[in-house]
Amino acid sequence: MAKGIIIVSDPNPLGISHKLIAPTIKLLYSKRGLDCSVIDLYRDEFNPMATDATAANLIARHYKHIIKTADHIHFISNVNLGGVSPGLEGFFDQVLNKGFAYDVVNNKTKSRLHKKEVYFYLHHSKKMRTRFNAAWMRLKFSVIPTIFKSSTIFQSDLTWGINEVKSKKIKKIRNKLISKLFENK
């Protein structure tokens, strides 16, 4: 049975990550009888600056175990000043590191997580969203080829201004998630 994990890195518990994207993904899994759990890096007080020597890094070991057992991994992050959240950057450094997520053989990276289905959900303020922004480029040319080999990146600039616009955008995002997550299943 497939197992999903949702990793949320958004400090706002009332934001789109917690109120729309994560619940929608979790609902899709539960409707199909699949297990899906949520990791909230901010609620867990994950320290993106921790090192292997600190006691705070025990949580990184726990996250590694969860990643190992998951078939589908969903990363949700807001984009600040052109990059993913510091919590998610710390997660990449501490959890998805060399020796766990990939190895280097003859100066080439060899993924250990290449069989996982991976999805990234990035949401921006309207002013920062461009197709080829810094967060997208970091994932597309650094994180994904090294660790996962392939994945899907969703980008959104959802704003909470006008209710009619908000409803249309939410419906569009939800339909996109449904079609991408379970397109051939």
Where are these regions (language model features)?
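N-terminal beta1-alpha1 ligand-phosphate binding loop
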Residues: 2-34
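Glycine-rich phosphate/pyrophosphate-binding loop and the adjoining helix
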Residues: 139-185
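Short, solvent-exposed amphipathic alpha-helices that sit
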Residues: 17-29, 134-149
